[in-house]
Swiss-Prot record:
Protein name as annotated: UDP-N-acetylmuramoylalanine--D-glutamate ligase
Organism listed in the record: Hydrogenovibrio crunogenus (strain DSM 25203 / XCL-2) (Thiomicrospira crunogena)
Localisation per UniProt entry: Cytoplasm
Presence of the UniProt keyword RNA-binding in the record: no
Record InterPro entries: Mur-like_cat_sf, Mur_ligase_C, Mur_ligase_C_dom_sf, Mur_ligase_cen, MurD
EC number assigned by the record: 6.3.2.9
Pathway note: Cell wall biogenesis; peptidoglycan biosynthesis
Positions annotated to bind ATP: G107, S108, N109, G110, K111, S112, T113
Catalytic activity: UDP-N-acetyl-alpha-D-muramoyl-L-alanine + D-glutamate + ATP = UDP-N-acetyl-alpha-D-muramoyl-L-alanyl-D-glutamate + ADP + phosphate + H(+)
Length: 449
């Protein structure tokens, strides 16, 4: 008998999948206050429990389907493992049943963007594409979807990969590694190891050029991507091909799309595009497909999204910047495009991360860093004291940034932290930032967003 543990979106997708397969199961949510009444109506044949695992179930459970938010290190989960119970996740169930080519993407930053780019390119080439995992719908919902998909494109988090063992992919990538989720992992190496499992059974590993530097072991069959510039790149390398003095995205000696044709300019956007091209290598897509996608793709919400330009100041929502690596990348990318400097708004739940790298970026590129939220004082200890100011709330941070910013500057909201001290998630947090910008800046003088 299966136990579905965790009844959020992922757990509910597992219940739906089991119902479609006629598979009996138990269902547990470890939150004592969780209301199961609606789920009990939807799944009358399932026994539900909240809080702790009922002792009468223990001898009947062969396999636990663990939601990503529940760690395998939880005492009750470890006890079940020690008793010989299989512990898997929804992605493992998906892998066992998919039966179609899968492209899988993980990394500390850029996962959603690259996943979307790959999906858009394959759709443009005529494939029916199912997109899910850590983006959009849970992966198992793709299997019960009425569309008969030709290929699946999955964004996967380290939490999902912890409980995935038999995923076979036509192409897979670890886009990058930077410290994240140190409140869940004992060491950075554990986080890296979880990410690396995505490459265990792939036909094509797509890796950044600096993968050895970030501690990733070399797999067997691979292509690499990075910002090398050459008239002809080495075999199986994606980068910037120089042609008649112009920079093109391409591979080896093939110039595919001129950099100037991209709707999004900036080095990290070029890296995302190159990763997308490399992941599409098994499908042999045309240059015309790549160019159309990159000409029209303007980015995802809450990811270095310009929400207002007024009086020479650019206001940017990067609420999805939930770790130090993402925020440093955003600062560096945006600073390239400015005549002035960056005013950074950051803070929230720091997840026990090391913020020294952020401190270096603040020194080099920021006029000021405004910190708010639960861990602002902890973060402040690792940043240059002459460049930081502390406030309690995001609204206060926006008002303060307004007084500091000068023409040519950008106010970058890239928290480098999780959101759940003051917000439900990064989306609610980003929407709040945009609302404050409209309220305090745009509406005050009739600016246009």
């Amino acid at each position: 008998m299966y136990l579905v543990a965790g009844l959020g979106l992922t757990g509910q997708s597992v219940l739906n999948y089991f119902a479609s397969q006629g598979e009996p199961c138990y269902a547990l949510d470890t939150r004592p206050e969780f209301d199961t009444s609606e789920l009990e109506k939807a799944y009358p044949d399932v026994a539900f429990a909240t809080g702790t695992l009922p002792t009468q179930w223990c001898g009947k459970i062969d396999s636990i389907v663990l939601s990503p938010g529940i760690a395998k290190s939880e005492p009750w989960v470890k006890h079940c493992i020690n008793q010989g119970t299989e512990v898997i996740g929804d992605i493992e169930l998906f892998a066992r049943a998919a039966g179609k080519p899968i492209v899988a993407i993980t990394g500390s930053n850029g996962k959603s963007t690259v996943t979307t780019l790959v999906a858009e390119a394959l759709k443009e080439a005529g494939y029916a594409v199912g997109v899910g995992g850590n983006i959009g719908c849970p992966a198992l919902d793709l299997l019960t979807h009425p569309t008969e998909f030709d290929v699946y494109v999955l964004e996967l988090s380290s939490f999902q990969l912890e409980t995935t063992y038999s995923l076979q992919t036509i192409a897979a990538t670890v886009l990058n590694i930077s410290e994240d989720h140190m409140d869940r992992y004992l060491a950075l190496e554990d986080y890296i190891q979880a990410k690396m499992t995505i490459l265990n059974n792939t036909e094509l590993a797509v890796l950044p050029l600096d993968f050895e530097r970030v501690g990733i072991a070399r797999p067997g069959d691979e292509v690499r991507f990075g910002l090398n510039y050459a008239e002809a790149l080495p075999p199986k390398e994606y980068g910037i091909v120089m042609k008649n003095g112009q920079a093109w995205l391409g591979w080896e000696d093939h110039a595919s799309v001129p950099v100037t044709a991209m709707a999004q300019q900036g080095l990290h956007h070029q890296l995302n595009a190159l990763a997308m091209m490399a992941l599409c290598r098994p499908f042999d897509l045309s240059d015309a497909v790549f160019e159309k996608v990159l000409k029209t793709f303007k980015g995802l919400p809450h990811r270095t999204q310009v929400v207002l330009e007024q009086e020479g100041v650019r206001w940017i929502n990067d609420s999805k910047g939930t770790n130090v690596g993402a925020t440093v990348t955003a600062i560096e990318s945006i600073k390239e495009t400015l005549d002035g400097q960056v005013i950074l708004i950051a803070g929230g739940v720091g997840k026990e991360a090391d913020f020294n790298e952020l401190g270096q970026a603040v020194v080099q590129s920021c006029r000021q860093a405004i910190l708010f939220g639960q861990d602002k004082a902890i973060i402040a200890q690792q940043l240059p004291q002459e460049k930081i100011q502390l406030v309690d709330t995001l609204s206060e941070a926006v008002l303060l940034a307004k007084t500091i910013a000068k023409s040519g500057d950008a106010v970058l909201f890239s928290p480098a932290c999780a959101s759940f001290d003051q917000f439900k998630n990064y989306i609610e947090r980003g929407n709040a930032f945009e609302a404050f910008v409209q309220q305090f800046i745009a509406n005050e003088v009739g600016g246009k967003s």
